[in-house]
Amino acid sequence: MAREFSLENTRNIGIMAHIDAGKTTATERILYYTGRIHKIGETHEGASQMDWMEQEQERGITITSAATTAQWKGHRVNIIDTPGHVDFTVEVERSLRVLDGAVAVLDAQSGVEPQTETVWRQATTYGVPRIVFVNKMDKIGADFLYSVGTIHDRLQANAHPIQLPIGAEDEFNGIIDLVEECAYMYGNDLGTDIQRVEIPEEHKELAEEYRGKLIEAVAELDEEMMMKYLEGEEITVEELKAGIRKATTSVEFFPVICGSAFKNKGVQILLDAVIDYLPSPLDVPAIKGIVPDTDEEVERKSSDEEPFAALAFKIMTDPYVGKLTFFRVYSGVLNSGSYVKNSTKGKRERVGRILQMHANSREEISTVYAGDIAAAVGLKDTTTGDTLCDEKSLVILESMEFPEPVISVAIEPKSKADQDKMGTALSKLSEEDPTFRAHTDQETGQTIIAGMGELHLDIIVDRMRREFKVEANVGAPQVAYRETFRAAAKVEGKFARQSGGRGQFGHVWIEFEPNEEGKGFEFENKIVGGVVPREYIPAVGAGLEDALKNGVLAGYPVVDIKAALVDGSYHDVDSSEMAFKIAASMALKAAVSKCNPVILEPMMKVEVVIPEEYMGDIMGDVTSRRGRVEGMEARGNAQVVRAMVPLSEMFGYATSLRSNTQGRGTFSMVFDHYEEVPKSVSEEIIKKNKGE
């Protein structure tokens, strides 16, 4: 089957936003207008096409990024709908990694919200060009220019409107196109009756002002246009479009458009903007990778002629076909039934069938080309982040890094029958989601599951019940504390056991010192003159790593320290790897008294939105939870409190906020960093963990 759409007519985009900004509704409408859906599904009725897991339909939030293909004006648009809830940021990271562009959806009443900031940061990390769609222009309190202001203030982004709304709230009935200098008025509710008209007289002045600002902003990034602009020459529509496209694809400029997906306004114009301004696979830099054996850096260009290379970015268990592996093809062509190499794991895989996904219906295809996104059936060993490539031309594409879980709970099956199924369910779920971990606690024998937040773990337990028919009891949430050293010291670890027969002997001197935050554990060998033989040095590093996992104060993993092996001694007969491992762990224990160990706790960035009259109660509540208020602002007729609060104090906050504000307050939180625990709290944690 020949290629249906050329590479330059392909767009791989993600739709990203804060929870409730209307992202899924926007995707729905795109599918409706591109002819993929015959009846529109409303998210708040639980009928949306993209939210296809049962819980998503119940909770009205998107959990897994569904990938779907649509067509618009001779272009193929592959869309990934990403979740906006903070507990699912890993889904967003995964999809951004394989996209070429994104649409950031904002709520016209709130503008940029905390999760928008997180997602925006992630998109910046991956260098993803973005268009901003200010949605919900029909909502009470909608304010387009306020929303644009929040993009400047909170994201420090060079964003400029390329459209202006005509009216707002109930009066929102049209859009001014600043590029083409015209307006679009809507004649019916389905948004299919659009009249292109001249800009209404009463809006002309504002439109001219903002068109001038737009041209100036684009000209600043384009020398030729700048010259024309300074010389007072007219800049044509084509030149302006080309300038916006160039600046957007190089991630220097972000066009802002507006609409109301729910009221079917502005969606076709959003699709036009995706095609006009977001990059095709040819416009983004070639992906880099390394050759497995030589570590030589190579690049794969977006072309069908290059050897096949793709990245698996999502695993899903489908009730009908089993395991689905979603992948993005960067170069080359893949036919169903062929063999590929999983170069990350060094395994050969057979691609049984290739499916093109549409939310949760699917179409079988025989071939995928460079730039496509599809799902494969039949891959046994491939997990998220693995590279699939041509067996004759191996490459490992840069993989994805996932954050460590911050919260854990103990979980136990309700019956013996559930016990066996639970193991299978947990391993399948952790295969699908790299930020979800399950392990058995060595000391208590309990099964512990860990993830990115309470909602994340609720949904995992829910999925176990629905998809795997496993009933389980869940314990109280536990915070993922960490430990670290605040002072440097040189300590000795000596393990000598000579009691007849072959003894054990290992002796080390290790210098411990604090490392930079986020750098983890670093081990360095500074032995001179062979006082500790070369073959035992890895054992010292391994001994330390093992001992660090169980902490020095309260049994939490020790992070961000440096250890240098500086001296020691050995015995010709009695020394062994085991003895040096034990000596290293003894040195770590000895460091407790000298290195000033402290406990660290995860701090959450919290944003609470409340009616003004509850301000005092909420501020008091935040302070009582050891929170620091970092800022306040009025948003419409509500107050927004931004604070940094320890995760351990946020359990059950949703219930407390509801009762404090008669259900009128909302909050969102996202993990920010680790911070030292106050002494009184630290003592309590140590006592609790030692069972006192």
Swiss-Prot record:
UniProt xrefs under Pfam families: EFG_C, EFG_III, EFG_IV, GTP_EFTU, GTP_EFTU_D2
Molecular function in Gene Ontology: GTP binding; GTPase activity; translation elongation factor activity
GO CC annotations on file: cytoplasm
Ligand binding (GTP): 17-24, 81-85, 135-138
SUPFAM superfamilies in alphabetical order: EF-G C-terminal domain-like (SSF54980), P-loop containing nucleoside triphosphate hydrolases (SSF52540), Ribosomal protein S5 domain 2-like (SSF54211), Translation proteins (SSF50447)
Keywords associated with the record: Cytoplasm, Elongation factor, GTP-binding, Nucleotide-binding, Protein biosynthesis
GO biological process terms, semicolon-separated: ribosome disassembly
Subcellular compartments: Cytoplasm
Domain tr-type G: 8-282
Gene3D superfamilies attached to this UniProt entry: 3.30.230.10, 3.30.70.240, Elongation Factor G (Translational Gtpase), domain 3, P-loop containing nucleotide triphosphate hydrolases, Translation factors
Alphabetized InterPro entries for the sequence: EFG_II (IPR041095), EFG_III (IPR009022), EFG_III/V (IPR035647), EFG_IV (IPR047872), EFG_V (IPR035649), EFG_V-like (IPR000640), EFTu-like_2 (IPR004161), G_TR_CS (IPR031157)
NCBIfam families with a match to the protein in the record: EF-G, PRK12740.1-3, PRK12740.1-5, PRK13351.1-1, small_GTP
Function, in words: Catalyzes the GTP-dependent ribosomal translocation step during translation elongation. During this step, the ribosome changes from the pre-translocational (PRE) to the post-translocational (POST) state as the newly formed A-site-bound peptidyl-tRNA and P-site-bound deacylated tRNA move to the P and E sites, respectively. Catalyzes the coordinated movement of the two tRNA molecules, the mRNA and conformational changes in the ribosome.
UniProt similarity note: Belongs to the TRAFAC class translation factor GTPase superfamily. Classic translation factor GTPase family. EF-G/EF-2 subfamily.
Record-given protein name: Elongation factor G
Organism: Bacillus anthracis
